[in-house]
Each structure stands twice: as C-alpha cells, then as structure tokens.
Amino acid sequence: MKNIPEVKVGIVAVSRNCFPELLAVNRRKALVEQYIAKYGENDIYECPICIVESELHMARALNNVIKEGCNALCVFLGNFGPEISETMLADCFDGPVMFCAAAEETQEDLLDGRGDAYCGLLNASYALNLRKTKAYIPENPVGDAEECADMIHSFIPIARAIVGLHNLKIISFGPRPSNFLACNAPIQALYDLHVEIEENSELDLLESFQKHNCDQRIDGVVEEMKSELGVGNTIPDILPKLAQYEITLSDWIRTHKGNRKYVSLTTKCWPAFQTMFGFVPCYVNSRLTAKGYPVACEVDIYGALSEFVGTCISEDVVTLLDINNTVPKDMFNQQIRGKTFVEGEYALSDLFMGFHCGNTSACKISSCKMCNQRIMARFLPPEVTKGTIEGDLVPGKTTIFRLQSTSDSKLRAYIAQGEILPVATRSYGSIGIFAIREMNRFYRHVLIEKNYPHHAAILFDHYGKSLYEVFKYLGVPVGDIDYNRKRNNYYPTENPFID
C-alpha cells in the first residue's frame, strides 16, 4: 500500500550524569540487537548520541535522528535519565514519541550496574506533563532488552497512524444526502487532528467524470476488473462506466492532494447519483480501498477518517459497514446455537449483521458477484442501479470501531473486538454475521446512548490494543473511548436492577 507512511523509529538512549553513561549505551545496544534479531532493521535507527543531562546533547541527538529520516522517536532510559533534556527532546521532535526504560539485568550486578530507570520514568512522566508533551508509554514500560524491543515494535502501528493523520487530506463529494443527519461532520475536530479536508460538490465530480469519457485507460481497467471478478462478472456491460469512474477518482486524488502525502475519500451514491452517472459506485469504492485509498459511502467524512486510521494500523484492507440488522432466531437456532467458533459459543444477543450495499473489496468477500443495488432498484430503473459487489464477508477475527466528532466538535471513539462467523447470511450486499460479546448492551449504552452514526469501520483481525493507544494519543478523553464491557461491568447509563 502506497497511501500510508513507512515508520522509522529513532532510538535515543538517555543517562543521568551521576550514573555510568556506558550502562545506558550498552543497554541501548542490547535493545537494538534484540530488535533486529526479532523484527529486522528496517523500522529502527540507533542514534549514536547518548543524552547525558545536557541540552546540547539533546540538540545533537535531535538533529541526528532528523537527518537519518526518523519520523518517530523512542526515548530509552538506560538508567535514571535526565528528565529535563529527555523530555525536551520529546517536545522538540515533530512526530510521535514513546518512552520506555531498562530493567535491571541480574542480581550479580546491583552496585554500579543498577540503573534505577524504574524510578527515573516517574520523573520523566512528571516533566512530560509540565511541558504538555504527548508521549506513548506502554502498559509495562520497564523491561529487559527483548521486552523493550517488543514495546517498540508495538509502537510502530500507533506511530504509523499518527504520522499518517498529520499528512492526510480527506476529499469529499457532497453534500450529505437529504434526510441523513447521521453523517453530520463538524470539521473543527479534523483541523484539531491536523487533517486537511477538501469539500467538493457532486456536480464537480460529474463534470470530471464526463471529461474522462473515452479515456484511453478505460480498457485496461476493465480487464483488471474482469480478472478480479472472475465468474462473478455477471454484468459486464457496466464495467466501462465503472472503469471511467475509477480513473476519474484516481486522477482527482493525484491532482488534488496538494502538499499532503495521503488521501481518503468519501462520495455520494444517492439520491441523484444513479440517474446522473448511470450506475452505483460501490465496486469502484471497494477497488480503491483495496489499493489503500479508503472510500467511505454517503459522504461519511468521519467514516473515511476511521477507515484511514484502520488502514494505517492494520496495513490491510478495511471496509465501512452499517451496524444493520438482527440475526433471525431460526437462523441462530439452526446455525449458531451451541456451536463453538474461534472465540467460543455465542448468545443471540451477541450477534448482528454488518451490511453495506456492495463496497467491500473482493479479497474480503468469500465469493463476490456483480449485482444491481437491490434497495435502489425498488424505485429506480434497474439499468442505473448496476455496480455493487456482493457476497458474504470472509470469516475470522474482526474489530469494529469509529472515531467521531460530536455536533459540538468533541472527539469520541469506540472499539469492540469479535469475529465474523462462517455462517451464510442468505441475504444481499457486502454482509456478514458479527459476534461481539455483550453486543446488546454495547449497542444500547454506547452506540445509541452516545448518538453514534450507524456506520462502523471494520478491520479483519483484532487491533483494539493499537486503536486504543492511537485514540489516547490523539487526545480523545479516556472516558470517551468506549468498548464492549464484560458482564457485571455496568455502563454509567445501565440500569443495575434489570435482570
């Protein structure tokens, strides 16, 4: 994927002047050796400058990691550490920063070999707060060389999302459909996140689409589509128009991203789109998303934002689905009740179907097929509703989440992990049966209670750990990062007297 950053973490050791500098240097070397042995050398850079309680050392280390192309930073306390210069480094570095610290290695060397980084990290946290400087501190931030290497590796997807957002432009084509308040998108919070937004009209897109009529690249894209769809290419006559639209959006990305490095899109697909363009855009949305350019439906700007975050963290294809409908009791009784899945058995109250008309990439659908958009075809001529890619989602672990601004421009988020069940939905669209523990309570006391839109970003594995840290780093209050609580862990609005 070319539309997400490559992260290079500069590792800078720091030392208190009353502790041996060599202790911090040797611990840094051991950490780097462990990292390279487990994960390779491409993601990190070992800064040769150890900061020993000196602002001049700090400036030299800062210039060194910048010169070496580092866009993320690990401040490694090899001993107690100098809280002024080490946090000044974090404050001056323009990118995501983490702190971790060295544990004592052996009982045989607790005289000159004792570093007291466990204590020093407390001072570092205090100084970071004084400077109002953000930093990622792992759950267990003090460890041996291998454990600190693992911490840095866990930091990389977090850093990738932060760096990506600081260089992101969301391109939208709207306005949102009438009678669709759910996709209200106050843009102040985007600027608070350093995300750029370019809002265009549907008419701008139509004009550009028409200018791409008879584009010489159309035939090549059609062949790509035929190859991807295979036996699912049931409406071949629509492919040239879809190819023309894909080229239109691709060119718009190229010519409009400006000084930003990464792009996410959100477009309209109703009510006038079908009749004016002559198709529905779902399949094209899915193809661009598979190429690393997430496209959210229905002018869902924060859906596009969430999909991009998910793409950065997972380095995989994402999708955007409605939290859509319940699972019928007869389906549950015949296909799900009493059966053991990846994460065990499920109750009916844990289940829902996630659906969208046909925007999920072919690689995430068990068996895809080109179709008419069934809902639109109920009131429009069938010939203008072609263009959805339909099929049941690939089963396996999943994460549903959303980063959203409230109407008064406050950020909040939710995350829930579960699985997509290997059970046929017997329905239409890009669709799957989702199993999320205690989903009924999560639905009522998070999604409804906090007025979330019905769109959720979908990842095809468990990424809650990284998402939670990204949202904290972005400044979402921890009380507004919701998740599906376990039984007997009540939500603030939950009635404790209900059986």
Task: Describe each model-derived feature in a short phrase.
Residues M88-G115, L122-A127, K134, S286-V299:
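Short, acidic/small-residue loops that bind anionic groups at enzyme active sites
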Residues T289-T425:
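C-terminal catalytic subdomain
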Residues K2-V9, D43, E105-N233, I238:
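Cap/lid and interdomain-hinge subdomains that line or gate substrate/regulatory clefts
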Residues M1-A37:
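N-terminal basic/disordered segments at the start of proteins
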Residues C70-N79, M98-C100, Y262-T267:
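Periplasmic-binding protein-like
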Residues G220-I313:
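Long, internal scaffold/assembly segments composed of regular secondary structure
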Residues H57-C70, E86-L89, T248-G258:
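Short, well-structured alpha-helical segments in soluble
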Residues N372-D499:
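Extended hydrophobic packing segments that form well-structured cores
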